[in-house]
Design a protein with these regions (language model features):
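Hydrophobic, proline/glycine-rich low-complexity stretches
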Residues: 1-19
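Short, conserved turn/kink motifs that form compact alpha/beta structural patches or helix kinks used as
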Residues: 19-189
Length: 189
């Protein structure tokens, strides 16, 4: 009888993470039971890797067609012992300038004040418009939802116009809620 740990090794591919580390795995379409019409982001895939591969939730890697994918917690496959791990993959279709607010304490008021922004590079993410909500002056403000593998924080600035409102850690990735200008050039590819 064949060893189940070797099944699929002949059809696996080499992928490269955004930090340059290589790993081997298979990229599969999810079963119909895992696809819903209420999916929030672009079509998902399933990444199946050997149990010893160095792949974790939140890892970003390049797909075979040149796009980037983000791994999130899915499940493991067992036959007496763990033989493989699977991750859900969200296609990262946006790359945005990412900045973090620099603060200092005002000596007079003893309150925090923003003294500039620290550039954190480019943030690969998937993002979608959710709704317009009114601010205190009844001016409609667009709201967005973003998913990424980086440690973004409330108050971070994306593309000089979008502010991170709230961040939650869900299935091993960061889900952020944003507010900002209507995104034309920044949101469109």
């Amino acid at each position: 009888m064949g060893d189940l740990a070797r099944v699929g090794k002949s059809i696996r591919h080499c992928f490269i993470k955004d930090n340059g580390v290589r790993f081997y795995g298979q990229l599969l379409k999810p079963p119909m039971s895992q696809t819903r019409t209420s999916s929030f982001f672009n079509p998902r895939r399933i990444l199946k890797v050997d149990r010893n591969q160095n792949v974790n939730n939140g890892d970003v890697f390049q797909l075979l067609d040149g796009e980037w994918g983000l791994c999130f917690d899915n499940t493991e496959g067992y036959y007496r012992d763990a033989i493989y791990r699977t991750f859900g993959v969200i296609i990262m279709d946006k790359e945005m300038k990412w900045q973090r607010r620099k603060v200092e304490i005002d000596p007079l008021t003893k309150m925090e004040k923003t003294v500039g922004y620290e550039d954190l590079g480019m943030l690969k993410c998937a993002m979608e418009f959710t709704a317009y909500t009114d601010d205190s002056l009844k001016v409609p403000q667009p709201r967005y939802r973003l998913v990424c593998g980086k440690n973004i924080l409330p108050g971070d600035l994306l593309d000089d116009e979008i502010t991170v409102n709230h961040v939650e850690r869900v299935v091993g990735v960061n889900l952020a809620y944003l507010r900002g200008k209507v995104l034309g050039k920044a949101y469109q590819s």
